[in-house]
């Protein structure tokens, strides 16, 4: 259905619709050596790659990028192309599943419109904004909770 997980959620903070994303699907893996180790055998490409990815992903990747043939039939140029595509996988996401399914969002009340000490609106005295309603983005891992508590505490000192 699409891509998800911590890395994709983190990238989504910076991605704009229509932007291309480049992903190294095998960081730290010398795929050229891995494929060449299987060259003496009739191991299908899909089976070599399945050691690194879920089977459905591997099958779909081969379907879209390179037919799964025995690696002993691959030329050096073929192997280099496969390596390049997996270490520099380029895609343009078609979009998201929308706000209803979002795990992260961006936007909100501009921090320049608030007192950083009190979280009070500079335009409307007595109006305070805290937590996820403020345009503050952090790394995954509970930072949104910390921001909610800290900004709530700051505002609470002045309400």
Segments (PLM) and residue ranges:
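N-terminal low-complexity, intrinsically disordered patches enriched in charged
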Residues: 11-14, 116-117, 151
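A glycine-rich dinucleotide-binding beta-alpha-beta segment and adjacent secondary-structure elements
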Residues: 59-137
């Amino acid at each position: 259905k699409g891509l998800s997980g911590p890395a994709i959620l983190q990238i989504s903070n910076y991605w704009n619709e229509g932007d291309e994303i480049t992903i190294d699907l095998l960081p730290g893996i010398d795929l050229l050596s891995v494929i060449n180790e299987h060259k003496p055998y009739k191991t299908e490409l899909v089976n070599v790659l399945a050691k690194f990815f879920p089977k459905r992903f591997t099958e779909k990747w081969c379907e879209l990028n390179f037919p799964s043939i025995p690696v002993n039939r691959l030329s050096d140029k073929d192997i280099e192309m496969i390596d390049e595509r997996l270490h520099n996988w380029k895609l343009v996401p078609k979009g998201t599943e929308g706000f209803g399914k979002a795990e992260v969002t961006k936007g909100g009340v501009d921090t320049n419109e608030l007192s950083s000490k009190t979280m009070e609106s500079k335009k409307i005295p007595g109006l305070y904004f805290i937590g996820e309603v403020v345009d503050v983005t952090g790394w995954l891992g509970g930072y949104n909770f910390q921001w909610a508590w800290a900004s709530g505490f700051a505002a609470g000192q002045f309400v």
